[in-house]
């Protein structure tokens, strides 16, 4: 099997001529900090063991309260690399649960800033909420994500 030589050359050039590797390592350090601080500050939630990286499309980790779990829902903190955007998602624990909840929420009016999915069978969220924060300020990012998560969990009440 052959792979794209040009892309391999581009990758090598980026690694050799920029701080790409160090920058990505710093991002991972920041994202792990975000997860660990949220877990410490939100004891009523159970957190996924680590972070998941998805080939630089996005990185994420999920967590849930007992109420969310009982309703087959979870919260997901997501960093979308292409748009350089931090978001919190309310998602189903599986595609079936997500579609059921999307039907229930179809006519639900969401607070400003929240966006519901148009296609729950092909997206990984029911509702997403972008988080506006100075990303390198770890403590501010933790606080902003915590507020966003609480808002999204409150959508069900």
What are these regions (language model features)?
Residues 1-59, 67:
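Charge-rich, low-complexity N-terminal segments
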Residues 30-42, 105, 109, 145-156:
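Hydrophobic, Leu/Ile/Phe/Ala-enriched alpha-helical segments that form helix-helix packing faces
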Residues 22-30, 97, 140-144, 148:
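Short amphipathic alpha-helical segments
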Residues 4, 45, 71, 83-85, ...:
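Contiguous interface-forming segments/domains that mediate binding rather than catalysis
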Residues 110-147, 154:
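Well-ordered alpha/beta subsegment
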Residues 1-11, 76, 117-130:
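Short, compositionally biased low-complexity segments
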């Amino acid at each position: 099997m052959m792979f794209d030589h040009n892309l391999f050359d581009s990758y090598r050039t980026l690694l050799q001529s920029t701080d790409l590797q160090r920058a990505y390592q710093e991002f991972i350090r920041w994202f792990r900090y975000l997860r660990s601080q949220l877990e410490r500050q939100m004891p009523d939630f159970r957190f996924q063991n680590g972070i998941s990286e998805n080939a630089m499309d996005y990185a994420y980790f999920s967590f849930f309260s007992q109420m969310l779990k009982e309703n087959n829902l979870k919260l997901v903190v997501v960093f979308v690399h292409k748009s350089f955007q931090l978001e919190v998602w309310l998602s189903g624990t599986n595609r079936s649960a997500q579609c059921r909840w999307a039907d229930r929420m179809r006519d639900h009016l969401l607070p400003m800033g929240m966006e519901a999915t148009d296609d729950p069978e092909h997206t990984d969220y029911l509702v997403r909420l972008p988080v506006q924060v100075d990303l390198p300020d770890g403590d501010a990012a933790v606080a902003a994500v915590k507020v966003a998560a609480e808002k999204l969990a409150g959508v069900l009440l």
